[in-house]
Amino acid sequence: MLTRLRALAPRALPNGWPDLVRQVLIFAAAYYAYRLVRGAVDGHTTAAAFEHARDIIGLERSLHLFVEPSVQAWGETKPWIIDFASWMYVNAHLPLMIGSLIWLYIFRNRSYYFIRNVFVISMGIALVGYVVFPTAPPRLFPEWGFQDSVSNFIGFNTDTASTTSSLVNPFAAVPSVHVCFALIIGISMSRLVRPKWLRFAWSLYPLLMTFVVIVTANHWWMDAVLGALTALVAGTIAQALLARARPNKWAFAGARI
């Protein structure tokens, strides 16, 4: 058994233990800093968040694209859809992201560092959005017919729980990092796996997550668009600046296995 583990170690740890520890620390530090800044809420932020959300509603109505109430109302008529979407929002987003990053690190190590950089850059861009444009999500506007689908699904009010944690900000809606991260992972995995059905499934994942965040009233569709734009900008920066600076280490290697 020990011999077998030693034989597997070079593949599981393509750059050795020090690099693995370094990657874990980078993500842990970036994520904690992201959550800490993201969780900064005060009275001014709360007032501004609702005002910004009303501005979004006004803009979407002027474009005749205020579709979020209709999307959720349709989902609520089909309990299995709203329950599945709520489950996806709570349980699938983070495990899929972490699992994909682990797979990339082990099996597509040459591409992992580029994707890592895109994630870290996108977190930084998202934090700017949360500070500059705090926005209340649709679920906080029952007057428009919205329900908190996720709270109904898990059995307690997530916004009430959020007020007890300095790491949670109910007004961190713009951009949608659920959509941003889903797009980063979805595009990356669709280019790095071999089975056609799996490539197709990963390519649909960002669209699925966009539907999930809207039907559960956690984001406006404009949040989702800005989340996708955040991923695009982060990818452009990672390619134009970082990958050029260290092409042998930080460039994307798109070969499938």
Role assignments for model-derived ranges:
Residues 137-144, 169-173, 208-234:
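Interfacial helix-loop-helix junctions of multi-pass membrane proteins
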Residues 23-35, 94, 98, 119, ...:
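Alpha-helical transmembrane spans of integral membrane proteins, capturing the lipid-embedded, hydrophobic core
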Residues 2-95:
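N-terminal transmembrane-helix/juxtamembrane module of multi-pass inner/ER membrane proteins
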Residues 203-204, 216-257:
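C-terminal membrane module of polytopic membrane proteins
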Residues 32-36, 123-131, 204-215:
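Aromatic-anchored segments of alpha-helical transmembrane domains
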Residues 44-55, 67, 105-198, 242-257:
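Membrane-interface loops
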Residues 14, 18, 22, 26, ...:
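Alpha-helical transmembrane segments of integral membrane proteins
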